Amino acid sequence: MDLTGGFGARSGGVGPCREPIGLESLHLGDEFRQLVTTLPPENPGGSFTALLELPPTQAVELLHFTDSSSSQQAAVTGIGGEIPPPLHSFGGTLAFPSNSVLMERAARFSVIATEQQNGNISGETPTSSVPSNSSANLDRVKTEPAETDSSQRLISDSAIENQIPCPNQNNRNGKRKDFEKKGKSSTKKNKSSEENEKLPYVHVRARRGQATDSHSLAERARREKINARMKLLQELVPGCDKGTDFGGKIKIKVCFGVHLLMISGKKVAIFLWKVSCEDLIDCSFSPPRIQGTALVLDEIINHVQSLQRQVEMLSMRLAAVNPRIDFNLDTILASENGSLMDGSFNAAPMQLAWPQQAIETEQSFHHRQLQQPPTQQWPFDGLNQPVWGREEDQAHGNDNSNLMAVSENVMVASANLHPNQVKMEL
């Protein structure tokens, strides 16, 4: 019976496919038992220590087997003269032969057992059970479990990858979030830059009830126009002033009174009436709606200039009727404006200088007529006497009938004035 051949055949069959652990353990136990029982030692005496470790029945059988083998060797030497060497010699001690196949199977068996005990996870293989007789066998034993470990690692890695979410998805989600954050931050930066780039003024005027930027160019230009027109109006009418009412509207106060003139024996009173912005908008003489304080001031200036022209025309007509009377309108207007600016807003008649001069001239004329003898009596003495003289004779007791006075004070709002504001008193 060739044990080595059987061992080789069995080991070749075990390489590709692994048998169950129970069967391999049984086979290994039988093989070890056969080796111990069938292979006697060369020196039975030297193997006595080994026999002590065996059961008593096996030790007796081994002793009887050595006796029979020695008799057979003597017969063989007598026939052939040469003693064949034993198959396996223990070398005086009970030692196992160096069978490479058996060692490989034992190492494989130990590796499989440890892998199953560790749950197919550990990557280290125990090499203490492998004897240190052959280095090549150790290399083979080390390489084989390394392959199994790598395969098991691959399997475990695949399972872990199936369980753990893919990091690429997380990276993509993170990149998307970062991109969205960057987009939001960029939009915020753009908004802030646009706000910084905005000019510090507003070109369009705010509506009524809304605040306007006092530092805007449009507001500055508007105020400059208003101030320029106000200065021009103050030059035309020295007593005018600008103010605001409770509603915030700008009102113009023109401080000159009513002028009383007598033309062809009739009193002529010129009034300057108070007009507000609403009256200006609803005026019939200006169909288009006029908006803006500067435009209103322009209309006021035009109306004041027209009134001044009318006064000049009336004074010229009065001078043509009676050239001896010097009205001196400039001094009259200056005195009236000064008195009104001082606060005399009581509509009381103001006595002027020219009626006194007129009365003095009339008295001197009558005195000269009385001193000179009448050379010729005119039939129409009334024609030589001026008209205002006759009226004075008729109303001799009333001293204040021929005086120019101011009837009321005038408050003009920021509006144009109606052109037909000349009232004739009969």
Curated annotation (Swiss-Prot):
GO MF terms on file?
Answer: DNA binding; DNA-binding transcription factor activity; protein dimerization activity
Q: Where is the bHLH domain?
A: 210-307
Q: Which Pfam families match?
A: HLH
| Regions annotated as coiled coil | none
Gene3D superfamilies attached to this UniProt entry? Helix-loop-helix DNA-binding domain
Q: Example GO biological process term?
A: regulation of DNA-templated transcription
Q: Which GO terms describe its cellular component?
A: nucleus
Principal subcellular localization:
nucleus
Please name the InterPro entries in this protein's record. bHLH_dom, bHLH_ZIP_TF, HLH_DNA-bd_sf
Q: Enumerate the subcellular locations listed in this protein's record, separating them with semicolons.
A: Nucleus
Ranges of Polar residues composition bias in the record: 117-137, 148-172
List compositional bias (Basic and acidic residues) regions by residue number.
191-200
Disordered: where is this region? 117-201, 367-398
Q: Which UniProt keywords apply?
A: DNA-binding, Nucleus, Transcription, Transcription regulation
UniProt-listed CDD domains? bHLH_AtBPE_like
Expression by tissue, per the entry, reads: Expressed constitutively in roots, leaves, stems, and flowers.
How does the record describe its quaternary structure? Homodimer.
Name the record gives this protein: Transcription factor bHLH60
Lineage, opening ranks: Eukaryota, Viridiplantae, Streptophyta, Embryophyta, Tracheophyta
Give the gene symbol. Answer: BHLH60
